[in-house]
Amino acid sequence: MILARRAVLAATLTLAATLVLGAAVPSRAADDNSVDAIKKRGTIKIGVKYDAPPFGSLNPQTNQVTGFDVDIARAIAKKVLGSPDKVELVQVKSDNRVPLVQNGDIDAFVATATITPARMKTIDFSNVYYRAGQSLLVKKSSSVKSYKDLDGKGVCSVQGSTPEQTIRKLVPKANVVTFETYPECLTALRGGRVDAVTTDNVILGGYEAQDPANLELVGGLFTFEPYGIGIRKGNASLVKAVNDTLADLKKSGEYAKIHERWLKKSVPGDFGQWFNMPAEKAAEQFANQKPG
């Protein structure tokens, strides 16, 4: 009996010590992703998409990821570390980009992410760096011309995206199918499993450009999507560095060059109204819009 009591006491003390040490030493320090920590490390880890042309796509011939978001990521590396080459590009998807930045596995993501009130509860965002709008991609032979034509029809989007949430609200009778990546949605569209793919117009436009004989962008824009760069909650130094990068890109004219390089057109006339808009204001505008 005495030995049993001693064993219980020892186990209790060990557990208590473990809990105290665990509380005192978190698994990953909150400042591991600060600007100072990044400078000491010598590289910045930025998440980008590999399946969202022209914002981020992997070239199978060169095995290099390129795109609008990639150029923004390199500009951030240049601002923070003095060289655009001091960036480690990490593949992210719509459903894992937030957890990756929350856990400190990446320092930030530039990945076609809409600034929303819900997301701002879990991570911080930079100011707005691009504004898109939700649309539809269909086969050219399709009878679908608007989201209003989707009742009883199949529509695909990616998991964890705002377009998925929006289309469910707008067309509750649609058969919404989700995958992790856009290419999976395109396969479903071409194979007849779904009648449309929905996400931001610039992403859909990239896929339309790859197959203009068979695919068509329809429905116009029925939302606006203010894109921000996702950063770990409370990482004020990196938020400032990223916002300073955006301001520099506008002032130098480099942003306009990036826009023309990847989107094949000049910045829009309302560019000054939304570019570098504070994240809080962008989230409020997103929440107050009436899709349709």
Q: Where are the regions that the model predicts?
A:
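Alpha-to-beta junction loops
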Residues: I44-K45, G82-D85, N103-A111, G154-V155, ...
